[in-house]
């Protein structure tokens, strides 16, 4: 696929949208009524790498979408430990923790025939204050059906286009 939609709600209630429509990447901050756009590389995997590496945007769960997760994860995590078997929303899950040079992570993976992530916590060790990203993931649908407008951008009235921050730094 060449399309992806990420709807984010921050802990303060602010909402953001990252839309990869196959031609361009759009990030919209609805609360601030601003958006930024950049051309999208052809595949979602390449687009996510570009989004994180070149546009310097955060996409904490992007590694889960990578076909190279098995080779990339060992480079990020210098140490991985099995913590325990526990319950997440009534479902048995395996709690795994990893430590790396720049990030620490914890992931809870469902036990059984559908070993999908149920909870993820990522700590950015090199950033000021060591911020954490936490996600509770439920209602997995691995065979979704999308409506025609899922990947169409509907900008709010009077939304203002701004550059990505990294574009301001370019010579």
PLM-predicted stretches and their roles:
Residues 42-79, 83:
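Solvent-exposed helix/loop surface patches that form functional interfaces
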Residues 1-59, 129-133:
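An acidic-aromatic
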Residues 11, 26-27, 75-164, 168:
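Gly/Pro-enriched, hydrophobic low-complexity segments
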């Amino acid at each position: 696929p060449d399309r992806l939609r990420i709807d984010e709600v921050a802990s303060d209630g602010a909402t953001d949208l990252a839309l990869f429509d196959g031609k361009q990447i759009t990030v919209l901050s609805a609360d601030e009524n601003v958006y930024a756009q950049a051309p999208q590389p052809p595949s979602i995997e390449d687009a996510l790498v570009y989004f994180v590496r070149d546009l310097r945007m955060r996409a904490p769960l992007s590694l889960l979408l990578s076909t190279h997760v098995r080779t990339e994860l060992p480079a990020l995590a210098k140490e991985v430990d099995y913590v325990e078997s526990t319950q997440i929303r009534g479902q048995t899950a395996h709690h795994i923790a990893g430590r790396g040079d720049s990030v620490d992570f914890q992931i809870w993976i469902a036990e059984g025939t559908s070993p999908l992530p149920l909870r993820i916590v990522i700590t950015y060790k090199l950033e000021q204050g060591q911020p954490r990203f936490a996600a509770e993931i439920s209602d997995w649908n691995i065979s979704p059906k999308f409506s025609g407008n899922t990947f169409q951008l509907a900008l709010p009235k009077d939304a203002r286009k701004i550059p990505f921050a990294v574009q301001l730094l370019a010579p």
